[in-house]
Amino acid sequence: MTKVGLRIDVDTLRGTREGVPRLLATLHRHGVQASFFFSVGPDNMGRHLWRLIKPRFLWKMLRSNAASLYGWDILLAGTAWPGKNIGNANAGIIRETATYHETGLHAWDHHAWQTHSGHWSIRQLEEDIARGITALEAIIGKPVTCSAAAGWRADGRVVRAKEPFNLRYNSDCRGTTLFRPLLMPGQTGTPQIPVTLPTWDEVIGPAVQAQSFNTWIISRMLQDKGTPVYTIHAEVEGIVHQPLFEDLLVRARDAGITFCPLGELLPASPESLPLGQIVRGHIPGREGWLGCQQAASAS
């Protein structure tokens, strides 16, 4: 049996309102639990449109057929009008999710984090994280114990900024296996659970066709030599590609794969995890930098 952590990112108002309820129903039908990470502040995702001037981002949007994949309401959110508050508008859906699944913070403002966090000060990072955690805790009525950086935009500064919040784990980077981030010699931070597998929008195109994606990703899960963690998005697998995701759950079960919340991947003693660090890097299929796992020594 292969255990795979299932991470569900919720970036937008529509993803929360339409995608999450469908995912909850789908997961319930198949007896699967996952980790949901919510954006709870304003939905300004449409402001990413300026990135179309960047060739890699434009190619990604064309390759994934973004207009039909996400819908124009997502692609234009927060452009000509102020972005609506996601958490306030969908508190009931978020509370229901937290009743049945592990629930953590993705971002206060997904667009702001993905666009600006790379040059924010530690204080600005802490204030933004605090704003998101406070809002999410007010919605679900219990402490937030985990987080996942929006767009995997994380580095050593983000690791340090999250330390005051005493989270059980963070999932802020791409990598191969769980690790303890080294803050300074002799001091480690909150365990990191990296995403190890590509997302739909990173690979769909000439190399992998939509109709063969499930076969391809299951093969990758079975071949993963680390701790497999897979990310889906409420805006994609919860809406237009919900049937494809349901088919994935069936095929994965038949292949001996069990999906679980990320928290279930943590060992009883996190001190046993190897040391590592998060550095800025790049991966195929994704525009811009993102946090990547790198080995570190204790000295």
Curated annotation (Swiss-Prot):
Keywords: Antibiotic resistance, Hydrolase, Lipid A biosynthesis, Lipid biosynthesis, Lipid metabolism, Lipopolysaccharide biosynthesis. Its EC number is 3.5.1.n3. It is an enzyme of class 3 (hydrolase). One of its GO terms (biological process) is response to antibiotic. GO terms for cellular component: membrane. InterPro entries: ArnD, Glyco_hydro/deAcase_b/a-brl, NODB_dom, Polysacc_deacetylase_ArnD. Pfam families: Polysacc_deac_1. GO terms for molecular function: hydrolase activity, acting on carbon-nitrogen (but not peptide) bonds, in linear amides. It catalyses: 4-deoxy-4-formamido-alpha-L-arabinopyranosyl di-trans,octa-cis-undecaprenyl phosphate + H2O = 4-amino-4-deoxy-alpha-L-arabinopyranosyl di-trans,octa-cis-undecaprenyl phosphate + formate. Catalyzes the deformylation of 4-deoxy-4-formamido-L-arabinose-phosphoundecaprenol to 4-amino-4-deoxy-L-arabinose-phosphoundecaprenol. The modified arabinose is attached to lipid A and is required for resistance to polymyxin and cationic antimicrobial peptides. This is Probable 4-deoxy-4-formamido-L-arabinose-phosphoundecaprenol deformylase ArnD. It comes from Salmonella paratyphi B (strain ATCC BAA-1250 / SPB7).
